[in-house]
């Protein structure tokens, strides 16, 4: 019975590793896919080869094996804790009647069309702007190497095509990362006299980091989050943990 349960657990770990690597079939590759997949593969190997694990923990490398296991366990706890904080930040919407500036964070543009993730952000922005017709909007994001137009321009075009008045939309098309998204948007807000409380439109995993950058620019961030594509989301959540760590180390 124990062997059956162990094999089932190993198969689950292998399936989880494959799931994190699935975006590779669509040309998506980043570190947030790799380290969870590697951890699940390591767990699968430990479950499938228990005798080897026993020798490792009772042989000459016993202390090293215990240290590595403890470090990995601590890392998993940290990742889960940060994911909890990310989830909490994603559940902080603007209050009813609160004056906000909607800031739509850019994402990949394919030619002149939004990617799946950017389209989800545009849809969320459209829903909020439609329900709050007095709210101004800043579309953010510069032009990447493989993009024919800036991410900000793509957002603006799509929102206008969906029925949002173009006069409500300001363009910030110079930023190349989230920190610049917020810093350059803050400059527009100050110049135009817009509300300094911002409703950040982005994937849920992105909200905590965006709110940190917003606060450092003197803005008070609220969340208008959208769910990520089922195949892409988990890897981006785990990548976001590393991005938050990098931002902390760099002092952003």
Enumerate the predicted regions with their spans.
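Hydrophobic alpha-helical membrane-embedded or membrane-associated segments
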Residues: 7-15, 67-77
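Perimembrane helix-loop junctions in membrane proteins
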Residues: 26, 54-55, 83-93, 251
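A transmembrane-helix-recognition feature enriched in membrane-embedded lipid enzymes
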Residues: 233-252
């Amino acid at each position: 019975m124990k062997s059956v349960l162990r094999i089932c657990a190993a198969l689950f770990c292998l399936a989880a590793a494959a799931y994190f690597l699935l975006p590779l079939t669509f040309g998506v590759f980043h570190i947030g896919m790799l380290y969870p997949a590697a951890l699940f593969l390591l767990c699968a190997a430990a479950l499938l080869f228990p005798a080897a694990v026993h020798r490792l923990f009772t042989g000459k490398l016993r202390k090293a094996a215990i240290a590595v296991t403890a470090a990995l366990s601590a890392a998993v706890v940290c990742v889960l804790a940060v994911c909890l904080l990310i989830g909490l930040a994603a559940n902080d919407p603007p209050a009813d009647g609160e004056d906000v500036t909607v800031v739509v964070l850019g994402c990949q543009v394919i030619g002149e069309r939004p990617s799946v993730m950017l389209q989800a952000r545009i849809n969320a922005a459209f829903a909020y702007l439609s329900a709050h017709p007095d709210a101004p909007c800043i579309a953010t994001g510069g032009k990447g190497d493989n993009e024919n137009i800036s991410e900000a321009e793509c957002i603006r075009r799509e929102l206008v095509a969906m029925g949002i008045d173009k006069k409500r939309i300001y363009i910030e098309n110079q930023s190349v990362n989230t920190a610049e998204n917020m810093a350059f948007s803050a400059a527009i807000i100050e110049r135009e006299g817009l509300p300094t409380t911002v409703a950040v439109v982005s994937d849920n995993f992105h909200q905590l980091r965006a709110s940190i950058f917003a606060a450092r620019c003197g803005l008070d961030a609220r969340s208008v989050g959208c769910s990520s594509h089922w195949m892409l989301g988990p890897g981006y959540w785990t990548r976001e943990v590393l991005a938050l760590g990098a931002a902390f180390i760099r002092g952003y």
